[in-house]
Amino acid sequence: MKPARVPQTVVAPDCWGDLPWGKLYRKALERQLNPWFTKMYGFHLLKIGNLSAEINCEACAVSHQVNVSAQGMPVQVQADPLHLPFADKSVDVCLLAHTLPWCTDPHRLLREADRVLIDDGWLVISGFNPISFMGLRKLVPVLRKTSPYNSRMFTLMRQLDWLSLLNFEVLHASRFHVLPWNKHGGKLLNAHIPALGCLQLIVARKRTIPLTLNPMKQSKNKPRIRQAVGATRQCRKPQA
């Protein structure tokens, strides 16, 4: 697997308003999230990163919502997302709204989210789609050092591979909002070519039972039936 860790640090935006069409992205993401928020229950919801903190989660039944980030506002717990100050299996829902694109070690961040999530806990991930108008603008040299084009845009399939290694069950994966400057992202284009959407969303749950059985382990654990040992009986004829 191609390593995702990078040495350089790119400063993440403090709010959605710092991004071109950022508020439109946030609204589009919230529209996609609301139907899923109604399915989530528990005691604690963890929002990791400044952009996650601004996501409206009123539709979620989890009342205790904590914003965690290294800096910025509104932050309730100031901490490094790669070293979350929470106990194992203590969080019901973990929201990573465009947190991975500006993370130096996405694998480590996902492992931290996996660590703090309870069994069957919810993990929500959003990011930018590299195969979109957003991805094309990233190819322009003048824009590469400005947000959001200085972020890392991971393909949907690559992120799904990461989650499968951590034994997450993906319930939903989509791309949407094809036109970044449009309020609704271009309804007609969203309906016919959603694969070119600028935004992508993954909703997954942490599972404890392996989703794919290992055939090698399965054959080892399978009880074996002993084969009958062949035997010959010698019968002596009675003497006359």
UniProtKB/Swiss-Prot annotation:
Family annotation (SUPFAM superfamilies): S-adenosyl-L-methionine-dependent methyltransferases
Gene name of the encoded protein: yafS
Entry superkingdom: Bacteria
Record region (Disordered): 216-240
Molecular-function GO term, any one: S-adenosylmethionine-dependent methyltransferase activity
Stated name of the protein: Uncharacterized protein YafS
Residue stretches spanning the membrane: none
Pfam families: Methyltransf_11 (PF08241)
